[in-house]
A protein has these predicted regions:
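Secreted/extracellular ectodomain signature
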Residues: 1-122
Length: 122
């Protein structure tokens, strides 16, 4: 887990494939699908406040992945490690920015397609 959340991880647009082994569209290919739902901070831990909301962060998991409405938000990462600015958070694979809602209509405008990461252990 430590390597996964370190600079040594190998998550990028060549290795982050979908369930069929295909690369999702990155920022350069319409429709942009580079936002991956994670709900986590850069170190892989949950935001303080959790699915019940609260201080200092509101819910960042769309109600523990149960909401499909315009309300709420989830943290996403960029599988292609490419954001609109060069700041490290914008290029994070797991903690780049929140969605503007929890419905697909609110997830797609910022570059999402409702995708999640899945990992297999060796």
């Amino acid at each position: 887990m430590a390597e996964l959340h370190s600079d040594a991880n190998n998550i990028n647009k060549d290795t982050a494939l979908d369930e069929k082994g295909n690369a999702p569209n990155d920022r350069t290919k319409p429709p942009n699908q580079h936002d991956i739902l994670t709900g986590s901070r850069a170190d892989g831990t949950a935001f303080i406040g959790g699915s019940g909301g609260g201080v200092p962060f509101p819910d960042m998991t769309c109600g523990n992945w149960t909401k499909g409405t315009a309300e709420g938000s989830a943290m996403v990462g960029h599988f292609d490690r490419s954001g609109p600015v060069t700041a490290s958070w914008a290029n994070s694979w797991n903690s780049s920015h929140p969605t503007i809602g929890c419905s697909m209509e609110k997830i797609r405008p910022t570059g999402g397609d409702g995708r999640l990461y899945c990992f297999a252990a060796d």
